C-alpha cells in the first residue's frame, strides 16, 4: 500500500516537473545550462490526462549542473515484463525505454553515456533488452512518437551510437518502470533502469 501511495505521489510530482513554462524552448532545442529546465514536454499525439503510464522525469546532477531524463512509466499489472511471446517487452527487440514518447535525455553539458561522447542537447534513448545485457541506443532525433514502428531508417540514420551494458537484478520487485540516478562522485553517476526484477546501470560522466 505504501509503495502504491509513493508511486502515485511521484507521478504527480513528475508531471509538474515535466511541464515547461510557456516561453520554454521545445525539446531538441536546448544546448546550454537551461536544458534541464525546459525538459519533459509531452508529445501532442496523446493527452497527458488519463494516461495509464504517467509521464515522469529523473534528474542527474553532475558537476553542479542538472541533466534530465523524461519518460513514460508503464506498470507490470500482473504481466510478465521481459521475455518472449506475451511479455510486455520482448527480448532482443528495440524498446522505447518506457511508454508513449521515446525516453528523452536533455543534456546541458558535454558528457559520456556508457562511453558515447555527447554534446549538449537533447537525445532519444532506446534500448534492446537481452537476457544478460542490454544495448543502449542514443539518437539525435527527439520528435518521433515512441512506438518502435516509428523508428524508421531515416531516424536510425541519426543515431549517435549503440553500446552494451550488463543487466542485473533488483533487490525487490519493481511494479512501475523507474529511471533514477545513483551518484558516483561529483562528475559521475549511474542511470538505473529498473522494472520487474531487472536492473540496468548506464554509466554517465561529465566531460570538460
Short names for language-model regions:
Residues 1-16:
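Sec-dependent bacterial lipoprotein signal peptides
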Residues 18-21:
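Bacterial signal peptide processing site
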Residues 34-102, 106, 110-113:
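N-terminal secretory signal peptides
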Residues 72-74, 110, 128-132, 141-143, ...:
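Solvent-exposed coil/turn segments that connect beta secondary-structure elements
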Residues 92-148:
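Mid-length scaffold segments of soluble, non-membrane domains
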Residues 143-188:
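Surface-exposed, gly/pro-biased binding rims or lids
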Residues 189-196:
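Short, exposed beta-strand-loop hairpins at the edges of beta-sheets
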Amino acid at each position: 500500500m505504501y509503495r502504491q501511495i509513493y508511486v502515485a505521489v511521484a507521478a504527480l510530482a513528475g508531471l509538474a516537473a515535466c511541464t515547461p513554462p510557456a516561453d520554454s524552448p521545445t525539446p531538441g532545442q536546448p544546448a546550454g545550462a537551461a536544458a534541464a529546465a525546459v525538459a519533459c514536454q509531452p508529445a501532442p499525439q496523446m493527452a497527458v490526462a488519463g494516461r495509464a503510464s504517467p509521464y515522469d522525469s529523473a534528474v542527474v546532477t553532475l558537476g553542479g549542473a542538472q541533466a534530465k531524463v523524461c519518460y513514460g512509466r508503464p506498470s507490470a499489472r500482473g504481466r510478465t515484463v521481459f521475455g518472449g511471446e506475451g511479455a510486455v517487452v520482448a527480448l532482443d527487440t528495440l524498446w522505447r525505454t518506457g511508454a508513449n514518447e521515446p525516453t528523452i535525455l536533455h543534456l546541458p553539458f558535454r558528457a559520456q553515456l556508457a562511453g558515447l561522447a555527447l554534446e549538449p542537447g537533447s537525445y532519444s534513448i532506446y534500448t534492446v533488452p537481452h537476457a544478460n545485457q542490454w544495448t543502449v541506443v542514443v539518437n539525435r532525433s527527439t520528435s518521433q512518437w515512441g512506438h518502435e514502428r516509428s523508428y524508421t531508417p531515416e531516424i536510425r540514420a541519426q543515431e549517435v551510437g549503440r553500446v552494451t551494458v550488463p543487466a542485473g537484478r533488483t533487490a525487490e520487485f519493481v511494479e512501475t518502470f523507474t529511471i533514477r540516478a545513483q551518484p558516483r562522485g561529483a562528475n559521475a553517476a549511474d542511470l538505473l533502469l529498473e522494472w520487474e526484477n531487472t536492473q540496468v546501470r548506464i554509466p554517465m560522466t561529465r566531460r570538460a
